[in-house]
Amino acid sequence: MTRRTSIERYRNIGISAHIDAGKTTTTERILFYTGITHKLGEVHEGAATMDWMEQEQERGITITSAATTAFWRGMAGNYPEHRINIIDTPGHVDFTIEVERSMRVLDGACMVYDSVGGVQPQSETVWRQANKYGVPRIAFVNKMDRVGADFFRVQRQIVERLKGDAVPIQIPVGAEDHFEGVVDLVKMKAIIWDDASQGVRFEYRDIPPELQAQAEQWREKMIEKAAEANEALLEKYLSGQPLSEDEIKSGLRARTVANEIVPMLCGSAFKNKGVQAMLDAVIDYLPSPADVPAIIGHDERDREIERHPADDEPFSALAFKIMTDPFVGQLVFFRVYSGVVKSGDSVLNPLKSKKERLGRILQMHANERREISEVYAGDIAAAVGIKEITTGDTLTDPAHVIILERMTFPEPVISQAVEPRTKADQEKMGIALNRLAQEDPSFRVRTDEESGQTIISGMGELHLEILVDRMKREFGVEANVGKPQVAYRETIRSTVTDVEGKFVKQSGGRGQYGHVVLKLEPQEQGKGYEFVDAIKGGVVPREFIPAVDRGVRETLNTGVLAGYPVVDVKVTLVFGSYHDVDSNENAFRMAASMAFKEGMRRAKPVLLEPMMHVEVETPEDFTGNVMGDLSSRRGMVQGMEDIAGGGGKLVRAEVPLAEMFGYSTSLRSLTQGRATYSMEFKHYAEAPRQVAEQIIAARGSGAAARG
């Protein structure tokens, strides 16, 4: 089987947006116009093709990023066939891990904005993630038919808030109820879509006279941006010669691919206007796998190597999503960066040092699947039959090993105890939780050693709620869930030296002897734990030094204040002694543990609590109530601004997570259900003394017993 589409005609794109900007509807229209779905799925009827998990349909929000393949020949049928792989990404803050994960494997993104709401809190998070992975993007201002729609305001917000160089390549014809179509600034023609054919047919018309001056003004700005792509275009532009349509497009393309500009389009996906032209813009301006730099990884000796997006290079791919499918079991979604792989081939997972046989390879369309025999560089597909794999692992040709950069995942900030209702549920729950943790690296499962309870941790209340819900639906596990618990941390504030730990047992026969002297220092936030060996003259033999490190590491899990994990400390092994016969690894491990506990007590230990960045959008009448309530939750209000279009106020604050439980219910009653909020983890901060004392007292007996 040979390649159906050359790699230059591939587009791997993500569609990202703030919740409710109409992203799922936009994706639906793409599937419709590219000829895959024949009835348009509407989100508000719970029937969208991409939202394929039951909870998504009920909640009307997209949770799992499904990958879909579509083909496009241009809205006027004037392009060779292009293959567009779309990764649908969630717009809810609790699911940013999904967005981060898909950004890693995309070549380009289409950012969808609501014409009224504009740039919203989640849009900023998604933008930062796209910057982190260097993903070129175009912007689509959706819902132009809404009351208060303002395309140019969104353009200003992208420039001011996101610091993106937003370049309109279209302007709207009308707005709100009178939104009819767009002016294509490259062709200088109006595009009007036909309602009767659900937007499949369209016609070019002359620009309405009242828009002519505005169109010329924005076209001039666009041409200036395009001309800056290279010397030849700039020279031609500066000498006053007109640039051709192809020259404008190639200039805009070069600057978009280089992440210098963001072409902007508009439309109303719901009213079947604009999505078709946005698909053309994906082809015109977003990169193919061949336009982005080669992927860099490391070989087994940790030397840097690269792979180019070509079929004749050795096979390399990244597993970016793992899902359990009710029909075929575990599905591993992967992006092929180089080479070709056939079903039945063996590939190596170098991070697990394990060879895996690819059973079947499936190409997905939402939750429909087509079996294919091989995949090529640039493809996105799903494999069945891979046993041991975690999100972010590399799959590679066993004869030419490469380890691609691992993704980084945030630490969970909220925990809950979860208990099976019956004995039968108990066994199923273990299997279900392990499956879910394998699919979602921001979800953790552990057993509390004291209480024996199973503790689940995640990125927010909604995140855990949905995972418990999935346990019930997909695995038939009925479980009771405890009150959410905050993931506190402990650290130290001062340096202590000469902290001694001695573990000696000599009672006939072979004894135990380990003796260490440690120095403890606070590290800057986020630096984590660091161990330094400063032993001179072999007073502690080489072979016992890893045991000292291990002893400290094990003790980090339970701090001395309230038994929470310890972060951001530097431990230096400065001195010690040993016994020729009685010393062993275990003795040094115990000595290090004793020394660390003692040192921590002396180093001014403090309790840290997670602080959340909270944004509340509220009608103006309730602003005082909202701010007062946030302050009563120990929140620091950091700013307030008008929501464009007379839509009330946006209040930004930093609030401890411990004070935010059940906030959605309180906010509803404070504002008669008219305010919305979003929240994401910001950083850890020292808890005030009286708060810390309460937490320590509540955990006191346990911590005292542990100490």
Curated annotation (Swiss-Prot):
CDD domains linked: EF-G, EFG_III, EFG_mtEFG1_IV, EFG_mtEFG_C, EFG_mtEFG_II
Function: Catalyzes the GTP-dependent ribosomal translocation step during translation elongation. During this step, the ribosome changes from the pre-translocational (PRE) to the post-translocational (POST) state as the newly formed A-site-bound peptidyl-tRNA and P-site-bound deacylated tRNA move to the P and E sites, respectively. Catalyzes the coordinated movement of the two tRNA molecules, the mRNA and conformational changes in the ribosome.
Occurrences of domain tr-type G (ranges): 8-290
Protein family: Belongs to the TRAFAC class translation factor GTPase superfamily. Classic translation factor GTPase family. EF-G/EF-2 subfamily.
Cellular location(s): Cytoplasm
Gene Ontology CC: cytoplasm
Protein name, UniProt field: Elongation factor G 2
UniProt keyword terms in alphabetical order: Cytoplasm, Elongation factor, GTP-binding, Nucleotide-binding, Protein biosynthesis
Keyword Lipoprotein: no
Predominant location: cytoplasm
Protein's organism: Bordetella bronchiseptica (strain ATCC BAA-588 / NCTC 13252 / RB50)
Gene3D superfamilies per the UniProt record, alphabetical: 3.30.230.10, 3.30.70.240, Elongation Factor G (Translational Gtpase), domain 3, P-loop containing nucleotide triphosphate hydrolases, Translation factors
